[in-house]
């Protein structure tokens, strides 16, 4: 059955959404398999995305795991970053080869894919929504007071600009607040990040998050491998179960590509007769052109049609055309065409030589 690919940066709620979808589909009696980084690595390790060789091996393991599970009867959910469009195209090719539909669920953190933790009270005033560093409080150590002062100064500057008056100096009330900034929490982590950290237990360093953001290739519904596309911003937005069900169980599977299909096998007798008939036609043509003049109609063995003679032909040229005809005919074998092989080859020669 279908393939569901989750895509998004860390802390965007992918795992929670994947579990929500798994529970909803399992409640309908469907067999659902979830493939994620932890299932492949044994435990989620964010450091993999900092090493190109290990990340490439991880993508190969994820693709192999999906390919093993993918069938017309089970639903496979891939819960990973999947931020490279080339990898998403490979997954699309797997679904197309298995003749099963797929859809893409793109999870985005509120405030944009690179927004960091927000300042306390930022939701109450849009002008105070100031993004700060991804660096956790535990790594700040003695710099907590300086960080709090910087945040408060940015807050005051943002409020001043919103109110239409930019002030150069910090008021005394703000200075008194800065002195106690280290004692009161200055940063509040969004609910989506809390749930993501609680669910996975993995920590992505600020440098790694920045690198992933720069490498991230956002899905585009104009690409056939990125549609149908469902975009979810935050955890408050409900999961579009009706649309996902329609995409997975009502849509037709992507049409198979001709290069991925097995060509029909030709029987041994067909190939033997094809080789014999074309050889006889060439031998008859070489013999007939010895006494022919341009404009004559040549009658060749095994044919009911005629070939107009226009110029002398070499054996090398005729052999090349014979190989081309045999290669094409082997790809489309049909035992019903056996009596017409000589006429078909004669028509091919006539079109190729004139």
Curated annotation (Swiss-Prot):
Residues 116-149, 162-199 are annotated as: Disordered. Residues 170-179 have a biased composition (Basic and acidic residues). InterPro entries: KTI12/PSTK, P-loop_NTPase. The modification Phosphoserine is found at residues 184, 200. One of its GO terms (biological process) is tRNA wobble uridine modification. Keywords: ATP-binding, Nucleotide-binding, Phosphoprotein. The keyword Phosphoprotein applies. ATP binds at residues 8-15. GO terms for molecular function: ATP binding. Coiled coil: none annotated. It holds the Pfam family KTI12. Gene3D superfamilies: P-loop containing nucleotide triphosphate hydrolases (3.40.50.300). Belongs to the KTI12 family. This is Protein KTI12 homolog. The gene is KTI12.
């Amino acid at each position: 059955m279908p393939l569901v690919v989750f895509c998004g940066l860390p802390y965007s709620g992918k795992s929670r959404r994947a579990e929500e979808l798994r529970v909803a589909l399992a409640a309908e009696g469907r067999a659902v398999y979830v493939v994620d980084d932890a299932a492949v690595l044994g435990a989620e390790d964010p450091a993999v995305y900092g090493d190109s060789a290990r990340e490439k091996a991880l993508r190969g393991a994820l693709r192999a795991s999906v390919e093993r599970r993918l069938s017309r009867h089970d639903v496979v959910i891939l819960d990973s970053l999947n931020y490279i469009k080339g990898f998403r195209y490979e997954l699309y090719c797997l679904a197309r080869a298995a003749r099963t539909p797929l859809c893409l669920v793109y999870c985005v953190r509120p405030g944009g894919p690179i927004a960091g933790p927000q300042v306390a009270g930022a939701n109450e005033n849009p002008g105070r929504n100031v993004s700060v560093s991804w660096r956790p409080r535990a790594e700040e150590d003695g710099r907590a007071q300086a960080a709090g002062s910087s945040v408060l100064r940015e807050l005051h500057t943002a409020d001043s600009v919103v109110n239409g008056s930019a002030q150069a100096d910090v008021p005394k009330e703000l200075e008194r607040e800065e002195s106690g900034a280290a004692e009161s929490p200055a940063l509040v982590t969004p609910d989506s990040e809390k749930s993501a950290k609680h669910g996975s237990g993995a920590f992505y360093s600020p440098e790694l998050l920045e690198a992933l953001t720069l490498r991230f290739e956002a899905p585009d519904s104009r690409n056939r491998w990125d549609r149908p596309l469902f975009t979810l911003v935050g955890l408050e937005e409900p999961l579009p179960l009706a649309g996902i069900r329609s995409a997975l169980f009502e849509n037709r599977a992507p049409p198979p590509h001709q290069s991925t299909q097995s060509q029909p096998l030709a029987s041994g007798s067909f190939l033997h007769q094809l080789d014999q008939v074309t050889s006889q036609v060439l031998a008859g043509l070489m013999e007939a052109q010895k006494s022919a003049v341009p404009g004559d109609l040549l009658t060749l063995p095994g044919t009911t049609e005629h070939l107009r003679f226009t110029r002398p032909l070499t054996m090398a040229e005729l052999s090349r055309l014979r190989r081309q005809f045999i290669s094409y005919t082997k790809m489309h074998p049909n035992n019903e065409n056996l009596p017409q092989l000589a006429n078909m080859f004669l028509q091919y020669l006539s079109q190729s030589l004139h």
